[in-house]
Amino acid sequence: MPRSLLGRMLLLTLLAVLVAQGLSSLFWLSHLRSSQREGLLTSSRSLAYSMAASVSYFRSLPLGYRPLVLDQLRSMGGTRFFVSLNDRPLEMRALPDTPNKQAVLEIVQDVLHQRLGKEVELQVEFVSPDELRLFNGALKLDELPRSWAHYALTLEPVNPPVLVTQIRIGESEWLYIASLMPAPYVSLEPEGLQPQQVLSIVFTSLLLLLFTGLLMHWQSRPLKRLARAARDLALGSPSAALEERGASELVEVARAFNTMHERIDRYLNERGQLFSAISHDLRTPITRLRLRVELLEDERLQEKFGRDLDELELLVKGALQCVKDTDIHENVESVDLNLLLQHIAEPYLADGRVEVVGRAAEPYPGKPLALKRCIGNLLDNALKYGERARLSLEDGPEAVVLHVDDDGPGVPEQRLEQIFEPRFRLSPRGQGYGLGLGIARNIAHTHGGEVSLQNRREGGLRVSLRLPRLGLE
């Protein structure tokens, strides 16, 4: 199944066209064969009446006149029938039985018996021109003069079957009548699709697919613009409002997206203003409190209040840093991940605390500073708990994956997701407020990626950063 909307619509259209053309062709072919069979049976009845009239005429002639009449007919070029007198019925290989053949033979026999009498002895069969025998079986059709039989029994370039009727009209005297079926029913084979009709069906289907493809391409352009705008919004890149035009459904989607975009921008601006105000409002009373603490005479109490104020200030700075790190206003650029990793790991390469393996085949389209902060947070976390870290870069057609492995104690399985929560610490005595991994995951999300955790079998923790390549350009 194609992945694109255009490919799927073309495939569904092709299937629909094939089914429709197949059903219509079957219906048309069934109707055509029914009409052909009806016309064939009517022509057979008319031909049988003509045969019966010819037999009656020859039966009425005196015995001596019959050969003379046949000679005169041949000298005049013959009639629609080839007629001869034989002393016995000729044996010829008949054509295989088919429904049309059996129906024609039954009608011819019924008409002849009806006209000539039930007691008349006759044989009716269809024979191929190559198997046809004439004049007591001594001659083939090709051995006769063309004026004698070819007019009545051949139809070039078609090689239609010959209806041979042999009727006993006297002692050792059989009247031999051979004829083609009347046009256009010279063949007993059921009518099929002609090459011109097949070409017409193929041409119509291709034309319909072409127009459907053009229509879907035209209609899918607003969807592509919407997808591009959604990616820009996810990456924080500035983008203009979508044009609200096209089909009513597309206009409604574009309008809803523009409204959502405006609300998100307004929310981010209000959040920035709010945290700026909080930063200003909190630092002033904290500074005031520090001054008052210094005026205390009790040193023990002064130290206690100082620790609380340090913790409060660290909390405020951490919260502001979290907002700052996850709200990076950068344009998307081509980032050389190999160079970026070397730059981040350079301070630790000399003492062997960090090892970098693997390379990216192509630059990655993303935000340079945000990616640097994301990978830096992952590396700092690994060195903090494991002292050593290994950065493994894997590049593929769909995504770039960076594994950060450490030699630390690992994380309990039930707490793997809790690590990303702000202010979560595995050890109550640990320093900081657990914002690094959460910030890294948020930056990964803005690039359409993900950060996942997994305990290594040999010990330590593996943090995997997956950044998709598709759809980010």
UniProtKB/Swiss-Prot annotation:
GO cellular component terms given for this protein: plasma membrane
All copies of domain Histidine kinase, residue ranges: 277-471
Record topology, Periplasmic segments: 30-197
Superkingdom of source: Bacteria
Entry GO MF terms: ATP binding; phosphorelay sensor kinase activity
Protein name as it appears in the record: Sensor histidine kinase GtrS
Keyword tags: ATP-binding, Cell inner membrane, Cell membrane, Kinase, Membrane, Nucleotide-binding, Phosphoprotein, Transferase, Transmembrane, Transmembrane helix, Two-component regulatory system
PTM note: Autophosphorylated.
Function of the molecule: Member of the two-component regulatory system GtrS/GltR involved in the regulation of glucose metabolism and transport, as well as regulation of the exotoxin A gene expression. GtrS recognizes and binds 2-ketogluconate and 6-phosphogluconate via its sensor domain, which accelerates GtrS autophosphorylation and concomitant transphosphorylation and regulation of the response regulator GltR.
Pfam families linked to this entry: HAMP, HATPase_c, HisKA
Top-tier EC class: transferase
Record-linked CDD domains: HAMP, HATPase, HisKA
Induction annotation: Induced during infection of airway epithelial cells.
Positions of post-translational Phosphohistidine modification: H280
UniProt-listed Gene3D superfamilies: 1.10.287.130, HAMP domain in histidine kinase, Histidine kinase-like ATPase, C-terminal domain
Membrane topology: Multi-pass membrane protein
Gene name tied to this protein: gtrS
Compartments reported by the entry: Cell inner membrane
Observed effect of gene inactivation: Inactivation of the gene results in elevated ingestion and reduced cytotoxicity of eukaryotic cells during P.aeruginosa infection.
Cytoplasmic side: 1-8, 219-473
Catalytic activity: ATP + protein L-histidine = ADP + protein N-phospho-L-histidine
